[in-house]
A protein has these predicted regions:
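Membrane-embedded alpha-helical bundles that constitute the cytochrome b-like, heme-associated redox core
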Residues: 1-242
Length: 242
């Protein structure tokens, strides 16, 4: 059997992936404790520490995600949007070919993402972007942290209180009516953020299962490629360079 090795994931893509994994795991772990804080009897000071930790991990997560969005325009051939988003020239044919191969039990190898994988990656990236955006809003409404914290603090500060002195869980520093109005506007963002928490858990679980199943059935070094940047195939992949 002649094995051929192909370069696929550049260093920036690999760093993004594993930093994203670490951030998401940290956010899920801390976020779960925050959700259960009342049941666990966590005092307000403890909640502030938990939320602050969550936000700082979130900053790293968002910056990493923003860099990946930029890298989709300037990165390697398999990291670019034209190789990730589920449309473009030839995508429909590739998608139909993969479905046919699945029905027939055949393996169709790809150096980059498979047509079905491109849909999954796009959905996952969309969920991550929405979670990051809502998280930044909540960093401002809950802790008065950047990027929106100063504006929110100025809007809810009590008369005679400098906005820089507004603190979470300190009702004496805020105007009750302005604070209530802010919390009412915040409610849909909280619902979205919490719902996406469960959506992301489901998507991540499906992602891991799909990768494991593909590795077991067809090989392709999917996991190791995210360390080495290379995939190895016995047969020519469908998206090999000409």
């Amino acid at each position: 059997m002649n094995l051929q090795e192909y370069k696929v994931w550049d260093a920036s893509t690999r760093i993004f992936h594993w930093l994203n994994v670490l951030c998401v795991l940290g956010l899920i772990a801390v976020g779960t404790v925050i959700l259960k804080a009342d049941a666990l009897g966590v005092p307000n000071d403890g909640k502030v520490i938990l939320k602050t930790t969550h936000v700082w991990i979130g900053y790293v997560f968002v910056l990493n995600l923003l860099w990946r969005l930029v890298w989709g325009f300037i990165g390697g051939p398999y990291a670019r949007w034209r190789a990730i988003l589920p449309f473009g020239r030839g995508y429909g044919t590739q998608f139909a070919g993969e479905l046919s191969a699945i029905r027939e039990g055949r393996a169709v190898n790809y150096i980059g993402h498979t047509p079905l994988g491109r849909i999954a990656v796009t959905v996952l990236l969309g969920a991550l972007i929405l979670q990051g955006a809502t998280g930044l809003i909540l960093a401002g409404t809950d802790l008065y942290m950047p990027p929106f914290g100063k504006t929110i603090a100025a809007n809810v500060a009590a008369s005679g209180v400098d906005p820089s002195q507004v603190r979470p869980y300190a009702p004496e520093t805020v105007d009750p009516e302005a604070y209530k109005a802010m919390r009412d506007k915040r409610a849909p963002v909280v619902e979205t953020h919490e719902l996406r928490y469960f959506v992301l858990l489901g998507l991540i679980t499906l992602h891991i299962l799909a990768v494991a199943l593909t590795e077991l059935r067809h090989g392709g070094n999917i996991v190791s490629a995210m360390f080495s940047g290379r995939k190895t195939f016995a047969n020519p992949p469908a998206d090999r360079p000409n």
